[in-house]
Each structure stands twice: as C-alpha cells, then as structure tokens.
From Swiss-Prot:
Binds 3 Mg(2+) ions per subunit. It catalyses: tRNA(Lys) + L-lysine + ATP = L-lysyl-tRNA(Lys) + AMP + diphosphate. NCBIfam families: lysS_bact, PRK00484.1, PRK12445.1. Keywords: Aminoacyl-tRNA synthetase, ATP-binding, Cytoplasm, Ligase, Magnesium, Metal-binding, Nucleotide-binding, Protein biosynthesis. Its main location: cytoplasm. Belongs to the class-II aminoacyl-tRNA synthetase family. The lineage of its organism: Bacteria, Pseudomonadati, Pseudomonadota, Gammaproteobacteria, Enterobacterales. Mg(2+) 2 binds at residue 422. It comes from Cronobacter sakazakii (strain ATCC BAA-894) (Enterobacter sakazakii). One of its GO terms (molecular function) is lysine-tRNA ligase activity. CDD domains: LysRS_core (cd00775), LysRS_N (cd04322). Homodimer. This is Lysine--tRNA ligase. Its cofactor is Mg(2+). One of its GO terms (cellular component) is cytosol.
Amino acid sequence: MSEQQAQGAEAAVDLNNELKTRREKLAALREHGVAFPNDFRRDHTSDQLHADFDGKENEELEALNIEVCVAGRMMTRRIMGKASFVTLQDVGGRIQLYVARDDLPEGVYNEQFKKWDLGDILGARGKLFKTKTGELSIHCTELRLLTKALRPLPDKFHGLQDQEARYRQRYLDLIANDESRKTFKVRSQILAGIRQFMVGRGFMEVETPMMQVIPGGASARPFVTHHNALDLDMYLRIAPELYLKRLVVGGFERVFEINRNFRNEGISVRHNPEFTMMELYMAYADYKDLIELTESLFRTLAQDVLGTTQVPYGEETFDFGKPFEKLTMREAIKKYRPETDLADLDDFEKAKGIAQAVGIKVEKSWGLGRVVTEIFEEVAEAHLIQPTFITEYPAEVSPLARRNDENPEITDRFEFFIGGREIGNGFSELNDAEDQAQRFQDQVAAKDAGDDEAMFYDEDYVTALEHGLPPTAGLGIGIDRMVMLFTNSHTIRDVILFPAMRPVK
C-alpha cells in the first residue's frame, strides 16, 4: 500500500468514527425530547447586525442594551475553560458569539454546548457588544441546538478544494466558500435587475412550453423525451423564440422570458447542456433599437449590481461606461486577419480556400454564408474582448432573421460579444411568411444532407405568420455567460448551482 493509499484509509477510518459519534449524540438527543426543534425565531441576520452596529463603539452598544436573536451554522469554536467564542454563519455572513458558562441556564454549557460539533445549526439570543479587538459580538443568554449535523464540514472547514466535489455537492461548496455564495447572490441580483429593467420598459414576462412537438428557434441538437399520455415523442426546448413570436402575433407587443433551454451538445467551460436564457420580442422595432437596449441593459446592471461600469475579468477590465464597438462581420475579419481580400468572401471557392488556410474543415452542406461565418468565428471572435456588436450576418446562418433591404444575402442581425464570447444574439424578425417557409425548407434540406443542428419545419409557426406579425425585433442573452463576466468566473459550472455531471460510479 502506498503512503497516499494509507493516508486515504486512515482518513476513512477517522470519518467513520466521527459519523458514529455524531449519530450517538443524535440518539441521545432523541431520548431527551425533540431532536429537531422548530420553535426558534430569529429577528436579525448577521449582515443586518454588521450594517447597523459595526460603526458604534462598545459604550454605545452597552447604553442601547440591544437584545437580538440569530441562527446559523457553527463554523468555528474556541473553548477557553468557562467561556468560548463561536463563529456563526447565516445567509448574510458571520457573527461572533460569546458563550459564558455562568450566563446560560445550569448545565447548558458543559452538558450540551461542549458536546455540540462544528456544522451544527444553533439559535442564539443575547446582547450586542464589542470585544477588545473591536469585533461586533453577541453575549449569549440563550443557546439552543436546532439541527444536529451528522457529517463534518469539509476538511474541518479549511475549504472544499476538490473542483468536482464542489459541483456535485454544491451545498458543501456554499457552506465552505465565501466566493461561491457571493457568485450566486450576484446571479440573483442580475436576474432581479433584468426583470426590473424589462418591466420598466413596458415588457410583460411570460412562460412558454418546455416540451415541444417541434424544437425551434435555434440551430442545435435537441433532447428527446416521450409523453406517455399522448404517446408522442417530444423535445426539450432549445429556444422559446417561435412561441414568443406567436404571442406578438396575438397582440402582446413586448414580451420576455427568463428560463431554461436544453441543447444536447458538448460540455465545456462555456457550455452546459441545460442553461438559462433571457429572450425578448418588441413590436414596431428593429435590430438597431435592440442594440441600444442591450447596451443600456448591461450598463445599468453593472452599475446597479456591482456599483461600477468598470468590470474586472481575469487580466482584462470591461468598460461598460463608454459606447460599445460596432463592426460588421466582414470588418471584423479584415481587422483581425488584415491579409484577407474582402472581395474573396464573395466567391465560394476563394472563401473556402481562406477557411482551409485558417484550419477550418469545410462541410459539403455549407454555402458561402456559412463559410464566411466560420471564418469570422475562427479569426475574430476570440479578439472581441471589450463589448462589441457584430452585424450583417449571412442569411444562410440566420433562418429566422429579416433580410437586409439593400443586400438580401445578409440579415438585419447582430451578435454581442464580451471577453471573446458571444453573450447575446438579436435581429429584426422575419415576418414574411412565404420567405420563412422557404427558409424552413432550406433547413430541412440541410438536415437531410447531414446537418444535425438544422431546424425542423414548423408549419404552425408559418400559419401564425400568415395572420400577420408586426415589424418586430428579438433578442436572446445567455444569463450564465453574463454572470460569468460579472463575477470574474472562468467556467460556466461556477455560475450554475447544479451543473450537468457524469454520475459517480
């Protein structure tokens, strides 16, 4: 047996012994009455106490004579004879408890408190004061065990370092890591901020089907499920777009939805098969209006959530305070591959040669528009660090977008990039039912030619368009990637509470 194996075996024995001891303590609690009481009520959280009283001196606190009730998990404990200090952690942070034997009912300190374990959940009542070092604390007059923890905190609360374990046991990660808790609080604030922003501009939040007979609204491989009652194969949605635009046809002129999408594709630092999107549709608007809305949304969220428009990310700092850069797809290719002759992008064979020169394998089903788009993604996308809008996407890769009036080979579409990543996609919507039907047919042909991500033909959606879709613009923003940027997170798993994981065998 290697030294590492021996250490692992020893750790397993230690853990089993601790689990046994904790269960014995729980059994003793059961014998003496209610083991999991539910009658303790707190009146403050730790962050409220720090916000209200950190600025006061101990003499002021003594004069105020403030009694508070708090509850949370015992993270540290220093026993010093007849008195102890405890760090209690709750949703707002941490607060220190001062626990003295003579200030508690008889027997509580020695017979109960000393037998409790780190990780146990406690309720405490007492007066606020400050220690000699100036730390806000609670001088306890009541201390109760509310929940007995049967398992120890990770590594005696030196932190949960194993990355896989952090994702699989997110509850331990949230207990052990301040940064993880902060990340998901920021995520919640971002979602609340988006809703406030959208409602303030007259948008109505709606919900559309998660299971669909025809998966539409994006080019992606769907998950397939089966509806037993209907005896029908269905798909987890890859996007809500076509249903949201049906609502615009029905007269809801400004709608948005924040919800999950599912795409049966690879997992990477940027991709999770289950992810959150915000999509909006706005009647009597075009893609330029949504460029302005997107810029305003990100600037507003940065200021409201983070308190600044200068957002650090790795070695970069994103500047949401100044106007965002705007480039056409071809301008971006030229900027980041200066030797490109833009005229060559009008000829399939020449464009194919450029694609192959930069390492792209050109598929037989691709047309010129797809080739040009692939070139852009290869040579330019990673360089789009500061907030940048890319416009003039080819019609071939934009089956739901309105064609440009001056050049029908491109569409009135943009994608929004930050940090070399696509964060949003928006366009003036195609509301010509006949054009939409033809593009669906082109997608069917591409699927028949082997493109697994090509769209299905949605006859009901075409019928809806035949009833008349007002001039409309639509936008989709990846919430997970947005949160990554705002929290300086470098993998999407760090911003999804429970990311997709392969089961442990």
